[in-house]
UniProtKB/Swiss-Prot annotation:
This is Co-chaperone protein HscB homolog. Co-chaperone involved in the maturation of iron-sulfur cluster-containing proteins. Seems to help targeting proteins to be folded toward HscA. Signal peptide: none annotated. It holds the Pfam family HSCB_C. Belongs to the HscB family. It comes from Pseudoalteromonas atlantica (strain T6c / ATCC BAA-1087). Keywords: Chaperone. PROSITE patterns: DNAJ_2. One of its GO terms (biological process) is protein complex oligomerization. The gene is hscB. Residues 2-76 form the J domain. PANTHER family: IRON-SULFUR CLUSTER CO-CHAPERONE PROTEIN HSCB (PTHR14021:SF15). GO terms for cellular component: iron-sulfur cluster transfer complex. GO terms for molecular function: ATPase activator activity; protein-folding chaperone binding.
Length: 175
């Protein structure tokens, strides 16, 4: 399903979030199952399916990473996150350094500050990569699509790492 078409948006990495939210509200009203309470079972099922598509589409389009993945899927680019080995040696080394920093943070004199510092570094990298990703997605040639797919893989790792940092920060804050 093309969620851009569902929301009447031009496929683009940069979406008008206000327009997306407004269209979501309109589509929710049109497809909400309560509107079909007295309808036939078939119509109720169709409304439920349409409403699920609207919800799924909104979730995909509202976040940059899932929106990028959707754009690439629409272009026929397979995103085999787990199966595709990262070819960027420098990024692999950086991953190992970040993992080491994450592990070492709990033994630091001020673990929370160490985690916050790591989180700031990762957040800056995410911001930079999202900017690069937007540039590649504005193009549609094979090389740009492959570069965008590689950035999506990197961003997946970085978002997962940020989540792990948050978990460790929360655990420290509980004490």
């Amino acid at each position: 399903m093309n969620y851009f078409a569902l929301f009447n948006l031009t496929p683009s990495f940069d979406v008008d979030k206000a327009a997306l939210a407004a269209t979501y509200q309109q589509l929710q009203k049109l497809t909400h199952p309560d509107r079909f309470a007295t309808a036939s079972e078939r119509d109720k099922l169709i409304a439920l399916q349409k409403n699920a598509q609207v919800n799924d589409g909104y979730q995909v389009l509202k976040t940059p990473l899932s929106r990028a993945e959707h754009m690439l899927e629409l272009r026929g680019v397979e995103l085999q996150h787990e199966q595709k080995t990262m070819q960027d040696g420098a990024f692999l080394m950086q991953q190992m350094e970040w993992r080491e920093q994450l592990d070492d943070a709990q033994h630091a004199s001020d673990p929370l500050t160490a985690l916050e510092s790591l989180d700031d570094e990762v957040a800056a990298d995410i911001k930079r990569l999202l900017s690069e990703l937007g540039g590649f997605l504005e193009q549609s040639d094979d090389a740009a699509n492959e570069n965008a797919a590689n950035l999506v893989r990197k961003l997946k790792f970085l978002f997962k790492l940020r989540h792990e940092i948050e978990i460790k920060e929360d655990a420290l804050s509980d004490f």
